[in-house]
């Protein structure tokens, strides 16, 4: 799709909307084409990262607000690496945040950062972003130890896993920001990678730090969906 460039995140978010709207137009048209021509009523998992997660959130808003749309086949929306605010939920009152490992039709979201971080491009200061802890699949603020981390996986540009580290880090949800704070990561070892992020913003690692937990969870939610809906193929 015609992805908005990194420059779109260096200006006010409202000013960036025309560029993001172009990106979303492509994503929505592609999704509609798939649903109308290939889906055949099978359950769907939506997943995105960063701008892609913003696109997934927009899709979820549209189809939960549209009568007769595809909400009945949505297993879950993984909005990883983008904020989900109360304003977002108010715009689409049928949307809900995930609260466990198996609830369906819900949004799974988190933004990973060091405990010292107080603001980022993704979650600005004084903004609360709803999250779930991928180590416990709970929305409370209790710290979860690294032994609950099934494995961080790091990949090359082809997507191939080049390194896996079991029990990589623990994490907790920040009660003020709603972000996911990691407890066992050295910012010097995992730099932000982009100039728009300060040290300790682990945006680029959101999926990687919790890879195996996320992988397992997709299966859990699909199984839950199929059980509730009395069987069916997965697409």
Residue ranges and their predicted role:
Residues 47-56:
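Gly/Ala-rich beta-loop-alpha elbow adjacent to hydrolase catalytic centers
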Residues 9-21, 200-204:
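Second-shell loop/turn segments in exported
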Residues 1-8:
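Active-site machinery of serine-nucleophile hydrolases
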Residues 26-40, 61-224, 228-233:
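Surface cap/lid and interfacial helix-loop subdomains adjacent to catalytic sites
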